[in-house]
Amino acid sequence: MITIFNKLKQSLSKTSNTISAGIDKIFYKRKLDKETLNELEELLISSDISISVVTHIIEEFKNVKFDKTIDSDTVKEAIAKLIEQQLSKSEIPFTLSENKLNIILVCGVNGVGKTTTIGKLSALYSAEGKKVAVAACDTFRAAAINQLSSWVHRANALLITGKASADPASVAYRAIEESIKQNIDILFIDTAGRLHNNKNLMDELSKIVKVIKKLDENAPTHSILIIDAITGQNTYNQIEYFNDVTNLTGLIVTKLDGSAKAGVLVGAVQKFNLPVYFIGIGEKIEDLKIFNRHDFSRSLVGL
């Protein structure tokens, strides 16, 4: 049986193979000196680990190991520990309130796997005995509601929809009222996939947030941005724009199994001080995993 850690290693292989092979090549019978450190710096930056994080790693190597012969496994172990330290703020649990409705706003650009992720989350919490509902606020795209309906049905959750082309904020409002009536534990609000620089769509998202707060000034419980690891450095722009509109509480990172740019997660956490609640490492429902910074850091460098 494949373990969660081994599954994670497989998912990160496109990134970790590059980093691991690069480290092996750089430190084959060589000292840790200025030349090898420059090569290591270039390797890590090319894997989309942010410059600030890479600079910190290089400085730590200078302080501890400079001008000494070192093997590649020792380098990988050291990098993994340093990356884990940089991710110290990433492992905040995805907490839910008891005996009240938890409103979870889920947003993201087109194609990041937002609807699929909501389906997986619905299945996860339904299996734990929670009453789950999903508000289909992507009202202008019929295919989105059909896709969501399939996932929600599999998760044994309640789907709340509006009429075609209905105001998304009105659907969110009705979904909250209906969820309160039915004693729902968790309501996921699925918003339209939008480009972060499309003002009209971002205004629509802002309106949904205002409607939620009319019903509960402390809501939403969580505002989650779904990002995919394939995006690379553009992830930073997405987080910045969506955070301005929704005051994000955390991230879910998808498509780690298809990306050679998984290192971007490290820089995103370090730059925005946002936790990573879950990561997607495959297409199956069970492939949405709680983020573990220790396992991620080691897998990223091929350990």
From Swiss-Prot:
SUPFAM superfamilies named in the record: Domain of the SRP/SRP receptor G-proteins (SSF47364), P-loop containing nucleoside triphosphate hydrolases (SSF52540)
GO MF annotation: an example: signal recognition particle binding
The keyword Hydrolase appears for this protein: yes
Pfam family, one: SRP54_N
Family the entry assigns: Belongs to the GTP-binding SRP family. FtsY subfamily.
Chief location of this protein within or outside the cell: membrane
Function: Involved in targeting and insertion of nascent membrane proteins into the cytoplasmic membrane. Acts as a receptor for the complex formed by the signal recognition particle (SRP) and the ribosome-nascent chain (RNC). Interaction with SRP-RNC leads to the transfer of the RNC complex to the Sec translocase for insertion into the membrane, the hydrolysis of GTP by both Ffh and FtsY, and the dissociation of the SRP-FtsY complex into the individual components.
Gene Ontology terms describing biological process: SRP-dependent cotranslational protein targeting to membrane
Keywords in alphabetical order: Cell inner membrane, Cell membrane, Cytoplasm, GTP-binding, Hydrolase, Membrane, Nucleotide-binding, Receptor
Transmembrane annotation, as ranges: none
The organism's taxonomic lineage, starting at the top: Bacteria, Pseudomonadati, Pseudomonadota, Alphaproteobacteria, Rickettsiales
InterPro entries cross-referenced by the UniProt entry: AAA+_ATPase, P-loop_NTPase, Signal_recog_particl_SRP54_hlx, SR_rcpt_FtsY, SRP/SRP_N, SRP54_GTPase_dom, SRP54_N_sf
Group of enzyme by EC: hydrolase
Protein name: Signal recognition particle receptor FtsY
Gene transcribed to yield this protein: ftsY
